[in-house]
Amino acid sequence: MLTLLAPAKVNLSLEVLYRRKDGYHELRSIIQSLSLCDRLSFSPSKTVHISSDSQDWQADLSLVSKAVELFSERCGQNTGVNLKIAKRIPLVSGLGGDSSCAAAVLKGLNKLWGCGYPCWRLMEIGAELGSDVPFFIMGGTAMMEGRGETVTPLPTLTQMWAVLLVPALDMPADKTAALYRNLRPDSFTSGEISDKLLESICQGKLSLSLCFNAFEKVAFELFPELVKYRWQFLEAGAYQISLAGAGPTLFTLLKDKNTAEKIYHNLCQKGHQAYLVSTLGPLD
């Protein structure tokens, strides 16, 4: 049996530069893997069988099934697989769980079926599945550009602690598309925010004040209950709070574990769904 981890992520920066002629948006984003991971177990089988320990997760609605089908087409394999997924990343949370699992599927089948594709080829295939998938092939700390297909590894961050607050909100299936539709002219930026953040990372001193998410203002307008959760996060002791991807998860990054633990415990005492995790380097 082959077992792989599929880590969550947060966008330290997420800039939308402009809408492209092909309908996609040009992005510039610095992404960071987290130690909150789904676990995928692969074993040989004559047919494809996918299961999960989460009753809310449906294989046919996820990128996982699409990843198995696409990889089978690309490598010319009709071999099956028995795939079991232990879900830990909250669904539809902005933490990239579906994309991360899809990337793990590509890496796992590449090993299980002996296809021998290099990393760059897996990233090409991943780009056909979704914008975040190429990043998850690599993981760690990276700059993502284009619509997500261009990923450049960055120096691994000195370990930091992230506290995640997952609001108890029912999010629409087209959440990300709705955010894109509601972007305003002042939502678009030049990429300089990510450049400044990149400079601070390369100097080994990440400046949290530079964290930015183009979706944040729009998300708080479309889902006004986020305001309440943000205030409760502040009351728990957080001071620099960002939206994770397309949300609704909110997060804060800290260098001191004790401070992170206090914020985490304060959130849990209030009955919130919260996680205390660390930043993560690239996975093999």
UniProtKB/Swiss-Prot annotation:
Catalyzed chemical reaction(s): 4-CDP-2-C-methyl-D-erythritol + ATP = 4-CDP-2-C-methyl-D-erythritol 2-phosphate + ADP + H(+)
Residues of the active site: 9, 132
UniProt enzyme class: transferase
GO biological process, one term: terpenoid biosynthetic process
GO molecular function: 4-(cytidine 5'-diphospho)-2-C-methyl-D-erythritol kinase activity; ATP binding
InterPro entries in UniProt: GHMP_kinase_C_dom (IPR013750), GHMP_kinase_C_sf (IPR036554), GHMP_kinase_N_dom (IPR006204), IspE (IPR004424), Ribosomal_Su5_D2-typ_SF (IPR020568), Ribsml_uS5_D2-typ_fold_subgr (IPR014721)
Name used for this protein in its record: 4-diphosphocytidyl-2-C-methyl-D-erythritol kinase
Organism field: Dehalococcoides mccartyi (strain ATCC BAA-2100 / JCM 16839 / KCTC 5957 / BAV1)
Gene from which the chain derives: ispE
